[in-house]
């Protein structure tokens, strides 16, 4: 029997958080090995674990996978969260890439210089309210189904619900303006695996605070 996946990253959200979400939603237990110093990262580089010299890296099924999208694609395929055919996969990819466009803005926000944060937050709020959330609300309205693609849970739903939580940390109450997105969040959040992940003490990471930002700088800068 294969061991648990092992996630190599620092103790923060970053590019590993969607991987944590997807594994948790799939009901997969995983271990984490946190980088704490530049030396920790250097050791992974020197032993050949990091193909492109960077993390996230996930040990799974005898592989050492890098590149966030590749890792997510593998997990989604392995645990039947990637649609039933090529067309559904294409739509799922389109939706998850849209989510990623906004998520990357949120990811960088805590790490920005103080003088740039106000403009960045304003852009996040504007893009959320006028571009991304209306687009996904329209999708759900167009087919009237419980999930984004094929009327069953996929990685697109999980990525979107993660995004809804992250946006509300910066723009509280914004999801209330989008009733179908709010219903999707409730639906996914009440799935037993996701509900467990949302509980205190899980491997879900909090918003990157100043301490987390400093820890990341010690490793990566």
Curated annotation (Swiss-Prot):
Residues 3-83 form the GST N-terminal domain. It is found in: Cytoplasm. The keyword Lyase does not apply. Its EC number is 2.5.1.18. Glutathione binds at residues 9, 45, 54-55, 67-68. Conjugation of reduced glutathione to a wide number of exogenous and endogenous hydrophobic electrophiles. Catalyzes isomerization reactions that contribute to the biosynthesis of steroid hormones. Efficiently catalyze obligatory double-bond isomerizations of delta(5)-androstene-3,17-dione and delta(5)-pregnene-3,20-dione, precursors to testosterone and progesterone, respectively. Has a high catalytic activity for aflatoxin B1-8,9 epoxide. This is Glutathione S-transferase A3. The lineage of its organism: Eukaryota, Metazoa, Chordata, Craniata, Vertebrata.
């Amino acid at each position: 029997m294969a061991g648990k996946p092992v996630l190599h990253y620092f103790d923060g959200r970053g590019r590993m958080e969607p991987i944590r979400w997807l594994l948790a939603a799939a009901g997969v237990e995983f271990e984490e090995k946190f980088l704490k110093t530049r030396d920790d990262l250097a050791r992974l580089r020197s032993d050949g674990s990091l193909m492109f010299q960077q993390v996230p890296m996930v040990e799974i099924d005898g592989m050492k996978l890098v590149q966030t999208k590749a890792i997510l694609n593998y997990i989604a395929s392995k645990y039947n969260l990637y649609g039933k055919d090529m067309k559904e996969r294409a739509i799922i990819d389109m939706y998850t890439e849209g989510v990623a466009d906004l998520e990357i803005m949120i990811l960088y926000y805590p790490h920005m210089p103080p003088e740039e944060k106000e403009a960045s937050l304003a852009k996040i709020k504007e893009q959320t309210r006028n571009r991304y959330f209306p687009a996904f609300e329209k999708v759900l309205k167009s087919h009237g189904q419980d999930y984004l693609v094929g009327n069953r849970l996929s990685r697109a739903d999980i990525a979107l619900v993660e995004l809804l939580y992250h946006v509300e940390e910066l723009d509280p109450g914004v999801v209330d303006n989008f009733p179908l997105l709010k219903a999707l969040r409730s639906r996914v959040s009440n799935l037993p695996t996701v509900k467990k992940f949302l509980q205190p003490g899980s491997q879900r990471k909090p918003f990157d605070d100043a301490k987390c930002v400093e820890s990341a700088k010690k490793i990566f800068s």
